[in-house]
Amino acid sequence: MILSDRDIKKYLEEGKLVIHPIDDPQKQIQPSSVDLRLGNSFLHFKVEGRAYIDPTQDSPQELMEIIEIEEGKPFFLRPGEFVLGTTIETVKLPDDLVARVDGRSSLGRLGIIVHATAGYVDPGFCGQITLELSNINRVPVALYPGMRICQISFYKLSSPAETPYYKKAGSKYHNQKGPTASRLNIDFCKKEEK
């Protein structure tokens, strides 16, 4: 069951679901989702001179540099470019909800992809949402910190998760702040230790 605006407001009022800060509830709360805003930090790959990235050998965190954008200034996402962004809002899900993050239609019509594959948010997750931003247009697109960039919708589980994200061993992205690079290399390190 997808939560309606009425249910989203109830979950927020009761503190079961946390989205902070919601700057303008009238604009951000939609009929069955909440619009989230773009933060001002971006992670950009420093891959010049590299033939490929090997997640078993490379630490993606070391391959990225942070770009901070001043308030009111645009970040230009070039054609074919891929960067990690973040939402301003921190989201905390209860154990009986999962969430789905999708791009806003208005940005999709400009060729902006908001997530490559990671649109699913586990029950019990807490943190800012990392966005996998890319531009499939043929011209750069200006993105402004503070603009509504994506929407998050919520799905009720048949029962609360037995092991929500915050209790799961190896939860790599719990309590993440800002754009967070892939931690896939940790999976390979754990296999080698066994």
From Swiss-Prot:
SUPFAM superfamilies recorded: dUTPase-like (SSF51283)
Site feature (Important for bifunctional activity) residues: 119-120
Residues involved in dCTP binding: 104-109, 122, 130-132, 151, 165, 172, 176
Biological processes annotated in GO: dUMP biosynthetic process; dUTP biosynthetic process; nucleobase-containing small molecule interconversion
Enzyme Commission (EC) number: 3.5.4.30
CDD domains in the cross-refs: trimeric_dUTPase
Signal peptide per UniProt: none
Similarity comment: family membership: Belongs to the dCTP deaminase family.
Name of this protein: dCTP deaminase, dUMP-forming
Taxonomic source organism: Dictyoglomus thermophilum (strain ATCC 35947 / DSM 3960 / H-6-12)
